[in-house]
Amino acid sequence: MVLRIEDLDPRAQSPEAARLIMDDLRWLGLDWDEGPYYQSKRSEVYATAIERLGAGTPGRPGRGLTYPCFCTRSELHAASAPHASDGTYVYAGTCRNLNAAEVARRSAARPPATRLRVPDAEDPAGTIDFVDMAYGPQREVLATECGDFLVRRSDGVVAYQLAVVVDDGEMGVTEVVRGHDLLGSCARQMYLQRLLGYREPRYGHVPLLVAPDGRRLSKREHDLDLGVLRERYGTSGPILGAVASRLGLAEPGESVTADELVGRFSWDVIARHAADIVVDERFLP
């Protein structure tokens, strides 16, 4: 297991927050073999990858697939382009073919973001097929599901899709397990892996913890605050047991450790319990 602190956004760069995350992981019995690696300290690695996707460097030509994008967030949300299944917009290619003079004129007003071209819908290279370990066969046509996507924001912050692909590739990650809200990111990440020459890991997505109204639980709303639960229960067994029982890996009310769950884990079982887990007054004992 590789521990990576995904703190690309300057607002997320908090040593105290990282310390609390690691403390909570240890308390839950989740240890790691490598890290922690901080994305905020890897900007040069990401910049090199973007150069390879774009014009390249002297003596090492790139793929020529990136271009500057001047669209604002409000313009993108106001556009009539369709939206993908995860709610994000499908980029309409507004800035895709700007000439050099227009790029220079707009750049004088504000810095652009960097966007990556995807193949046309008719091009087989833009159709991504893979098998998720829980949700089975998946297919996405990049041109119709997302369009050209960001690899760097206008403020210079590297996009999540690019950063995790570079990190997974450079760190030798072979399996990625995460919430199913990121299932729609797989095709973009696999496209980047193929362009950059990285091995494609296996992906497994798991259910989310949601409120009774279906809202995804969030740290911002202090939903199911782990600090409060630590004070209430003292040990992690009841919490792990509550989650594991909803996934078919434990009996209702059973207290288990992370080590005990290792021997019980099965993707086949997870696939049969792939619905989101509702957290209400009956969730914890």
Positions of PLM-derived features:
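Non-catalytic terminal extensions that flank enzyme cores
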Residues: A104-R105, A121-D123, R215-R220, L224-P285
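A short, terminal or domain-edge coil/loop segment
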Residues: L53-P68, D123-F130, Y135, G253-H273
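Short C-terminal domain-edge/linker segments immediately following a structured domain
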Residues: W32-P36, G147, Q193-L196, P207-L208, ...
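N-terminal Rossmann-like or analogous alpha/beta NTP/dinucleotide-binding catalytic cores
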Residues: M1-D86, H180-D181, S185-Y198, S255-A258
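Short amphipathic alpha-helical segments, especially helix-boundary/capping motifs
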Residues: M1, D23-G29, A49, L162-G169, ...
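Active-site cores that bind ATP or allylic diphosphates and position pyrophosphate for catalysis
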Residues: G62, S74-K219, D225-R230, V279, ...
